[in-house]
Amino acid sequence: MPVLSHILGFPRIGLYRELKHALEQYWEKKITENKLLDIGRMLRMRHWKQQINSGINLIPIGDFSWYDHVLDMSIMLNNIPTRFHILSQKKNTLNMLFSIARGDSINNTTITPSEMKKWFNTNYHYIVPEFVQNQIFKLNCTQLLAEIDEALSLNHPIKPVLLGPLTYLWIGKTKETKEFDRLSLLPSLLLVYKEIFNILSKKNIQWIQIDEPALVLELPQTWLKAYLHAYDQLYQTKIKLLLTTYFGKIYHQLPIIKQLKVNGLHIDLTNCSDNDISLLHEQLPKKWILSAGIINGKNIWKTNLYDWFLKLNTITHQRSLWIGSSCSLLHSPIDLNIESKLNNNIKNWFAFAIQKCSEIKLLCDALNSNHNDNSDQQNILKKYYNTNIQRLNSNIINNPQVQERCKNIITLDHSRKTKHITRMKLQHNRFNLPLYPTTTIGSFPQTSEIRKLRLKFKNKQINEDYYYTHIQQYIKKIIQEQEKLDLDILVHGEPERNDMVEYFGENLKGFVSSQHGWIQSYGSRCIKPPIIIGDISRPIPITIPWINYAQSLTNKPVKGILTGPITIMTWSFAREDIPRHMIALQLALAIRDEVMDLEKSGIGVIQIDEPALREGLPLKKSEQSYYLKWAINTFKITVSSVKDNTQIHTHMCYSEFNEIIDDILKLDVDVISIESSRSDLQLLQFIKTAGKKLNEIGPGIYDIHSIHQPSINEIMDKLKKLLQYIPKDRLWINPDCGLKTRSWNEIRESLNNMVIAAKTLRINNGLNN
């Protein structure tokens, strides 16, 4: 049987982010719903044809999404959060989907959006399903069936994609005060899946890809037993199931997996050994398809196809084999061929989504032709990777000075020498901070004019003087706005930054940036990760001129905002030829240099953002302690040499911090702000446990991603809850994230209400403002 090619999913956003632009135009009522639907159909058809032209035998259907594939699954199961039922008579399915994701209002009553959470260990965000006890699911698969009919018109084999029932339950949350077992909902859920399977079998669908990435985790035994029960129930002879796992190894689950009633297994093999492949081949039922996920869907480096040919060649004679991407190519940019500004030698090291499809075909061709003793295809594979082998000795990637500096610093103790209680007194005296200090996270609204200005400067259409003058004008406006609001710690607003990671990537050696390497983060939000190609250093100061200019405009402290080493690494396409902890160490030394220069220039408040610290945590608990040890040490390297009266802040995304409270405490930052406003109950649990242990904390007091403007009373209610667990001299008041995606009108009202709430609290404590 020939080796078949497939992928688990394809990017949705379009080559030039057409989906992003269409969504935002629709939300702003600039295009009609029909126009939006037309753009969606156009993108799907284009993407399917791109896959077919690249040699993919089975194209995935159902991987397209208007906002998020997990939310799509909730809609398909008619799992609409109770608070949105009031909209059911006024909203069609598409608009209900947007309301759940973004929030809404009716009769002047705010309906809060569902929580947004990171998709396993990626920078993609999904909308968290919400469950209530005794919930009944009902099928609503109109969108999926429409897409299947569109795809069938191409007369090419297709493979519908569904999120599996156990993973769907695992990643969701109960919405009732009293916890209940989510597995109690499985019987109702399985009835809907059976209904979907029956409908698809009538359309003569042969294969369904059913995604169960939760299997890479170390699951409780009750959940593993539920897998056996679920796939017994779902088994039918009319349709075949490819059980799909990704984002890690699943060997610890093989005793359960090999008992499941499925027809094939897809495994992420990007971090496997030869022994792993042999183990899989030996243990899995011989009648199963083994789908080898050998093309890394989360990174942009070429694959050593010849090496994989040698590993897989013997298996092709013994079992049915498919070759695919490790995970969905959702996490990869679309097409390397439209990158016109990358150095050709460097560009030749990379593969984006379309090129990854071609890689899969190349390997399949070689494995299939090998049956005829044809060595031509093998030679093609060898030549394909030659440039990446030569890269390892290139001066572009190797910097002996950086490597030597890393050796010298790695064994030192990087703890701050003075306890926080002493530092806090020095810092509050230096800045004359009131009780409940107010601040923001860093960025302020980025208008189209700012973006155009940056683009013109990047394309050398304006000179440096013109650019600097106009950026300074924006900074001046941002400082003035904050002073009008009477915030306590100001920021310069980051008008010079396109993205918190890409900006530093553009200013550090060891990085390159693409023009069109966009990937989806959530909804219409796209990011363009920089690419780490070599050893990292900071040739000149990066932020000093902007921060110092901002500080010259005000007597209030201005925070220097830097992105931390773990986040820069995690949100970049990282090199794969050295360990991740070494990449992070190089970044820490570069950021440390920037921290010290900020302090020398007179900046006394410095924020090192690490929203990705928790995201980088390995999915398996048994592997987490090693990561946390080096990740915490990496952060400490960036700040260990600052003076006691320099206040160090960090900003993080809340995500199950309860599991790593002790490690968060080891950071020993002076102030931690947390993006958490959509997770109020979980945040309160964290605060209950850690509130009195943490130094100072600024829980995100409102959700900047929602269109809802918080009232003074809403903010006051939240603050009163928080003050039950946080000492009043340790509570800071701030939004939950940067403000760059909001408009000035939106943020003025929200920040004004936030400041009034802080002042009211001070008055209630018998203090002056």
UniProtKB/Swiss-Prot annotation:
One of its GO terms (biological process) is methylation. The keyword Cell membrane does not apply. Zn(2+) binds at H651, C653, E675, C737. 5-methyltetrahydropteroyltri-L-glutamate binds at R17, E18, L19, K20, K118, R525, C526, W571, E615. Its cofactor is Zn(2+). Its EC number is 2.1.1.14. Keywords: Amino-acid biosynthesis, Metal-binding, Methionine biosynthesis, Methyltransferase, Repeat, Transferase, Zinc. CDD domains: CIMS_C_terminal_like, CIMS_N_terminal_like. L-methionine binds at I441, G442, S443, E494, D609. PANTHER family: 5-METHYLTETRAHYDROPTEROYLTRIGLUTAMATE--HOMOCYSTEINE METHYLTRANSFERASE. This is 5-methyltetrahydropteroyltriglutamate--homocysteine methyltransferase. It comes from Blochmanniella floridana. The gene is metE.
